[in-house]
């Protein structure tokens, strides 16, 4: 069943500045008085945040790839039932920092589980609840990894597990994202992340504006259209 709201996801390898762009986009949409539900994966619910701790903790570095994937989809099932689907059914714009494309890129490509294994989980858990628009922030893995490692050092965080995987892992993840974009160009838009934050955000807002305008022109929920709202804010 097609939902009434709009589902937008932001994706990318670690170190692309994705979470910053996510925050700026959510703030911009809220300034327009649009009904926005901001969330993230892994996380978004109490159960999801607990799973996030398990996944990101350095001490779980030997977690088997299939176990990792199963944990992620367990958290995703809870997230969908508790947050995403109810918000979409109420006509909200759900903006998520990561969703199922992360599983295809990180576990399917990065962990070498393969796309079909991820798809099997996705059919059961996500079903028809797929993103309407996905923005992939793209950056050289070498540059992104340097950023991510610097960030973790500054924060003295124990959540460095994915950054610790090395360059080859992140190169595979990037290839996964670009392959998804190649196969689904209408839904997935690649945004260069090697530019200033403001420039990246301007492109993201333009892509979202275009999508929302097209959505309304095609008979979508008019409460989500830009209408007379100020696009420049």
Please identify what each model-predicted range represents:
Residues 1-6:
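Extreme N-terminal, non-catalytic leader segments
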Residues 13:
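P-loop (Walker A) phosphate-binding loop of NTP-binding proteins
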Residues 18:
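Conserved lysine of the Walker
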Residues 21:
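Hydrophobic positions on the alpha1 helix immediately C-terminal to the Walker A/P-loop
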């Amino acid at each position: 069943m097609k939902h009434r709201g709009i589902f937008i996801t932001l994706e990318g390898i670690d170190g692309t500045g994705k979470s910053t762009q996510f925050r700026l986009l959510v703030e911009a949409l809220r300034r327009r008085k649009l009904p926005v539900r901001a969330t993230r994966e892994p996380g978004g619910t109490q159960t999801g945040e607990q799973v996030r701790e398990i996944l990101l903790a350095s001490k779980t570095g030997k977690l088997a790839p299939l176990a990792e994937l199963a944990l992620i989809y367990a958290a995703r099932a809870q997230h969908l039932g508790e947050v995403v689907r109810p918000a979409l059914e109420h006509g909200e714009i759900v903006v998520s920092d990561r969703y199922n494309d992360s599983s295809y890129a990180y576990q399917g490509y990065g962990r070498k589980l393969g796309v079909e294994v991820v798809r099997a989980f996705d059919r059961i858990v996500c079903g028809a609840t797929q993103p309407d628009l996905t923005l992939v922030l793209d950056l050289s893995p070498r540059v992104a990894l340097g950023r991510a490692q610097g960030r973790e050092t500054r924060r003295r965080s124990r959540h460095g597990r994915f950054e610790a995987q090395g360059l080859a892992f992140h190169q595979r993840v990037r290839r996964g994202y670009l392959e998804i974009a190649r196969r689904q160009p209408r839904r997935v838009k690649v945004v260069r992340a090697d530019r200033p934050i403001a420039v990246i955000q301007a492109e993201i807002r333009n892509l979202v504006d275009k999508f929302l305008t097209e959505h309304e022109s095609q008979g979508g929920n008019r409460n989500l259209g830009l209408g007379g709202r100020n696009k420049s804010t």
